[in-house]
Amino acid sequence: MKCVNVRERLIDNAIKVIAANGLDKTTTKAIVSGTDINEAYIYSNFSDKEELLARAFDSLDEELVSKLMLHLPIMFTPGLDRESRSRMLFTSIWTFLMGNREKCIAFIRYYYSPYFIKYSADDHKLRYRPAVEMFSSVFADEADVWMILNYILDVMLSFAVRVHNGHMREEDDYVEHIFRVIYRSVEQYFKKEENSNDE
């Protein structure tokens, strides 16, 4: 087995197990179950199970921030009002969350766990620095952009997990409501645009 391939498969399997069973039941045995990978490969590729879980979260987090950075230029599209631009960005990220149930649930379970604070919080903040820098030109100078981004992510993840768990249906009016909750909460922090009708 190629080392890189095994490492990637272990990360993928860890994501699947976290999503299916939660972190408490994500044992090394469960991670390799149903594969031809021996448990020992976990310790030859990672220092311990905790590092494997952290790298699995890194993989998910990198994919999410990559998606955000891909669509973030929408916020600077000329000819559209700020709310329309914000809705387009929101829709892009929401569609990604809805289209990746397993990854979304695994992300949420790790993000709100003690593992995140202990192993991943610092790297997570560094990973989002480019997004914070881009958003800084949209928000007023006194706004805490990192806090605002965390709030937006928290709200989107909270509603996304409700949809994925079947507690709420993904309907157009429901999605619009989520957007409005977020937009109305943060619009007070936007920098005033010249020649804009935004209030």
Locate each region found by the language model:
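An amphipathic alpha-helix signature
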Residues: 11, 87, 91, 128-136, ...
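Hydrophobic alpha-helical connector segments
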Residues: 55, 70-99
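Amphipathic alpha-helical segments used for helix-helix packing
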Residues: 92-118, 161, 165
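Hydrophobic/aromatic-rich alpha-helical bundle segments in the mid-to-C-terminal region
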Residues: 105-109, 136-182, 189, 193-199
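Hydrophobic recognition helices of helix-based DNA-binding modules
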Residues: 56, 60, 64, 68, ...
